[in-house]
Regions:
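N-terminal export and membrane-targeting signals
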Residues: 15-32, 45-46
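C-terminal motif of bacterial Sec signal peptides marking the signal peptidase cleavage site
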Residues: 39-41
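Conserved SxxK-family serine transpeptidase/carboxypeptidase catalytic domain
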Residues: 43, 92, 97-99, 105-106, ...
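Short solvent-exposed beta->alpha transition segments
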Residues: 45-51, 65-111
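Exposed beta-sheet edge and beta->alpha loop/turn motif
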Residues: 103-162, 550-553
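Small/polar-residue-rich segments within soluble enzyme cores
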Residues: 113, 140-144, 148-150, 158-170, ...
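Short pre-catalytic segments that frame enzyme active sites
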Residues: 147-164, 179-189, 194, 198, ...
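Beta-lactam-recognizing serine transpeptidase/beta-lactamase-like catalytic domain environment
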Residues: 347-378, 393, 397-603
Length: 638
């Protein structure tokens, strides 16, 4: 077999044949060897930078800091910047896709797409690039912050930041802001940090007593009671909550106490602290999940001091829409001021808008508050205000009208039950409208007795009375009417005695039905649906026409003729007798401003007490709506 010679060996063989002198041979071999080496060195192509780029990007994805450090010229800067961005973005994952390489012998550029997985299913995607250089046959990543994001400079990182949405206000039906976004402050004790809680309880009690002397709205706390609660607590214990104004008085007195802190909390702050505090508290509880709006977010370029320099992505927040309640600021103030004129009594007033069922006002004196939400839930004999329903039943079931002649003797014996008018007054035989206006008990006892069992109860439900309502934010009871299987039950029910029971809320709803033509669905918070046990029915026109005429006559020439408020007012008075005395009632509506009302003074005697309160109420409504202070709420109180 012929010998095989490589490129260098061929040159060498040729030289051996031609060289005759050994010195020349040695020199020639050296020359040929050098030439051979030069040829081999120029032959291979440059090695690709792509594997190094891919390894670096994989290290970024997996946060392999050791691997990254070995591939870049600034390992400490690279790893710290990447860690800062991971942390700043609260990143849940990172995906990087190499999209292309540009390369020559010693310089390469890698182009890639970066996608960050962020909390709450959010992502951030963008394109960027890195530069690699080759030295001594090795490719190295030249570190720049732009490897992470093209907008990053030295000592900068990316950061995910929440953009808080404007929180919702609570607005009255007449457009006044009742509650606005603000802050409350919770006094918290960390019991785990205290060996003995008793000294702390004593200090807190003393601090609050001192603050109470500055602001009477700050409640005192008994040191012994607090110590017992702290001893039973496990970890943090919430002592009480303060408004922003109250916290100003409390903070200097509790600062520095071991284990004690004031925590700031977002809250709906009442602008007028004296306005229906119980009602405002109920509204606040009902809408607390609706006030925050939709938080936005941004990705910012942030320096080492935490200052945001620019945004690389931004999603604006969506402010929560205002929450509207049926409460009317002017009507509520007027109602509260009116009942407070009888502060010595359990006086209360409920106002409803007949056209849509908005609960405009619920007002009670402090004495009434002692028994709870009696304006909405209290059950009292309604007395003669109930004659609205008896009259409606007589018109619909017995064919009566305002001109029908009915008996109104001073007393009437009905199946052994002697019914008596107030002071036994007697009118003789008179039109139904006059008997209604003068409130003849005997007339309506007679009408009711002649009804069939259940007819009066059914009529009540047509006016919302006896219907069960589930009103978000409120608990209410309208009232009850007996079935009337026994004649005596029907007799007493006809003029609001016996087993008839009513709340001011229930009677306000009856008057609202007369005004509207069918029972409006009562509601407190717009968008919070009220559920009712019975579907409202439209009252026949002839029934409404007769009722309206009779209720108007009560005010113009009947038992409510002392009404001094302006406007076209319809009503019915009532004095409900009980063993201890009698309750004073008045219910009705004013045509011009779409207000139905019911007023009750427990043990108030004659109905004049409630007529006077209602008259003052309507006059105050007019004053508020026409005066310079119209709809003016004070600044938000902390």
């Amino acid at each position: 077999t012929a010998p095989h010679f490589g490129v260098g060996q061929s040159f060498l063989a040729l030289a051996l044949l031609e060289c005759q002198d050994m010195k020349k041979l040695v020199a020639l071999v050296a020359t040929i060897t050098l030439a051979s080496t030069s040829v081999v060195a120029c032959t291979p192509k440059p090695v690709s930078a792509e594997p190094v780029a891919e390894e670096f990007l994989q290290g970024m994805e997996s946060r392999n800091n050791d691997g990254l450090a070995a591939l870049t010229d600034a390992p400490s800067d690279a790893t710290s910047a990447l860690d800062a961005t991971y942390s700043g973005l609260q990143a849940e994952g990172l995906d990087i896709e190499l999209e292309g390489m540009d390369q020559d012998e010693t310089l390469a550029t890698a182009n890639y797409k970066v996608t960050w997985d962020l909390p709450k299913d959010r992502t951030l995607s963008y394109d960027t690039q890195m530069t690699l250089t080759k030295t001594e046959d090795e490719w190295t990543v030249r570190w720049k912050p732009s490897l992470i994001h093209p907008d990053l400079g030295a000592n900068q990182h990316l950061e995910l930041r929440a953009l808080e949405a404007k929180r919702a206000s609570v607005v009255s039906s007449n457009g006044v802001e009742l509650m606005s976004p603000g802050l409350n402050y919770r006094l918290v004790v960390d019991t785990s940090s205290l060996e003995d809680v008793r000294p702390t309880a004593s200090k807190i009690s003393g601090a609050l007593a001192a603050a109470h002397r500055q602001d009477e709205s700050i409640a005192d706390i008994d040191a012994k009671d607090l110590a017992k609660k702290l001893e039973d607590a496990d970890g943090s214990y919430s002592v009480t909550m303060f408004t922003e104004d109250q916290a100003k008085a409390v903070r200097p007195k509790v600062e520095g106490m071991d284990g004690v802190r004031l925590n700031e909390e977002p809250a709906l702050v009442t602008r007028d602290r004296g306005l229906a505090p119980d009602l405002m508290s109920r509204v606040r509880s009902a809408v607390q999940d609706e006030v925050d709006g939709q938080t936005g977010w941004s990705i910012s370029v942030v320096n080492e001091n935490g200052a945001a320099l620019s945004d690389v992505e931004k999603h604006a927040p969506n402010a929560a829409p205002s929450i509207k309640v049926g409460l009317d600021y002017d009507v509520q103030r007027a109602a509260q001021e009116a009942v407070n004129e009888r502060s010595d009594s359990q006086a209360m007033l409920v106002a409803i808008r007949p056209s849509n069922g908005d609960i405009l006002a619920v007002a009670q004196t402090e004495k009434a508050d002692e028994d709870g939400d009696v304006a909405l839930q209290g059950q009292y004999p309604p007395g003669s205000v109930f004659k609205i329903l008896t009259a409606a039943a007589g018109v619909e079931n017995q064919g009566l009208n305002t001109d029908s002649i009915v008996p109104c003797p001073g007393t009437m014996d009905i199946f052994g039950r002697v019914v008596t008018n107030y002071n036994a007054f007697a009118l003789g035989s008179v039109p139904l409208s006059q008997a209604f206006a003068q409130s003849c008990n005997t007339t309506f006892a007679d009408i009711s007795t002649k009804l069939k069992p259940g007819e009066l109860k059914d009529m009540g439900k047509k006016f919302g009375f006896g219907v069960e309502y589930d009103i978000p934010g409120l608990t209410t009871i309208t009232g009850s009417i007996p079935e009337g299987k026994e004649p005596l039950e029907r007799t007493e029910a006809g003029y609001g005695q016996g087993y008839d029971l009513a709340s001011p809320f229930g009677m306000a709803l009856v008057s609202a039905t007369v005004a509207n033509g069918k029972t409006p669905t009562p509601s407190l918070i717009e968008g919070h649906e009220t559920k009712a046990s019975d579907k409202p029915q439209r009252i026949p026109k002839h029934v409404l026409d007769n009722l309206r005429a009779m209720m108007r006559q009560v005010v113009t020439s009947g038992t409510a003729r002392s009404m001094a408020a302006g406007g076209t007012i319809y009503g019915k008075t009532g004095e409900a007798e009980i063993n201890e005395g009698s309750h004073a009632w008045f219910t009705g509506y004013r045509e011009e401003d779409d207000i139905a009302f019911a007023t009750l003074v427990v043990l108030g005697g004659g109905s004049d007490a409630s007529v006077n309160i209602t008259s003052n109420f309507l006059q105050k409504v007019d004053d508020y709506r026409s005066g310079p202070h119209k709809g003016a709420a004070p600044p938000a109180e902390g």
